[in-house]
Amino acid sequence: MAALMELRDVSMRFTRRLTIGERLAGMVGAGGETRDVRAVERVSLSVMAGETLGLVGESGCGKTTLGRIAAGILKPTGGAALIDGKPVMSGGRHPRKLTTRVQTVFQDPFASLNPRRQVGVIIAEGPITHGLIRAEAAREYVADWLGRVGLDPDFATRYPHQFSGGQRQRIAIARALAMRPDLLICDEPVASLDVSIQAQVLNLFLELRRALNLTCIFISHDLGVVRHVSDRIAIMYLGRIVELGPTRAIYVQPKHPYTQALLESVPKLRRRRGGARHDFRPIAGELPSPLAPPSGCHFHPRCPHAMERCRVETPALRPIAADQTVACHLYA
């Protein structure tokens, strides 16, 4: 299976001014009143044609930033994002031929849809602009895509505020897929929806994936959601990939202590022999600030297996089983 999308040694840093609270806390030093936020650090990933890669981690781990680099929304400060071996961005701009090949579905559909435009215009504008359809064929094209996402074609004349959150997300999905992309990036697409609506949107996603043979990067903090839609899963912590492998391997035999902690932090309904439920185990400690991440392995302050080596040496991502890699000194 060939790689459609490649992220090669990608890094992303943002410079921000310290807040008054941070200055009072004594963070102002040799670096002055600004600090670099290391959102992504030397990440390399491949997404195979036809697969869905899940990207999982706590809020602030850099997964959304990585998704935006893959989409060409952000230009990385190091490394490159490639689609079929060609840069997604060149000279800070999208090559026109590649613009339609990657599309994104964002977390908040109300913020990502123009409130002053009718749904039909929202869906048809991109395909018309890029010559995928002719303007006179737009009505039928829009009706077809609204039908595919389970909406009435008559909705084309309505505005985004007239729909529920789940319906707006379906419109956002239709807009993205109407561009006929080779890669779809879904950034927390169900996080803002009610649980019952989440299930409907996820089922729609699975149906469209099978029907259109979609290649996807599915970003979420919810392990349960990612498990149902992904072929492989990458676990991310403070800008680094700490584990990567097939979905079943990640859930049945997690290797990295952070992956294990993530799985243990999910409430379980199964009961033990004595009848008591499994304990809910939140991850120990707080997520460190990306302004000043820990040395060595970023997870070592929260890791129950931390050694002195973990504090001083960054672990490399190593293969430990078929198609499974982990960045942990326990497996060195």
Show where each model-derived region lies.
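Conserved ABC ATPase "signature" region
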Residues: 24-28, 137-154, 207, 263-264
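ABC ATPase NBD coupling module
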Residues: 31-34, 88-103, 121, 129, ...
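Conserved ABC ATPase signature
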Residues: 159-163, 167
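A short, proline-enriched helix->beta-strand linker immediately N-terminal to the Walker B motif
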Residues: 178-182
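Short catalytic/signature loops enriched in Gly
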Residues: 16-31, 36, 246-332
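Helix-to-loop junction immediately C-terminal to a conserved catalytic motif
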Residues: 71
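P-loop NTP-binding/switch modules centered on Walker-like glycine-rich loops
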Residues: 95, 189-193, 197-275
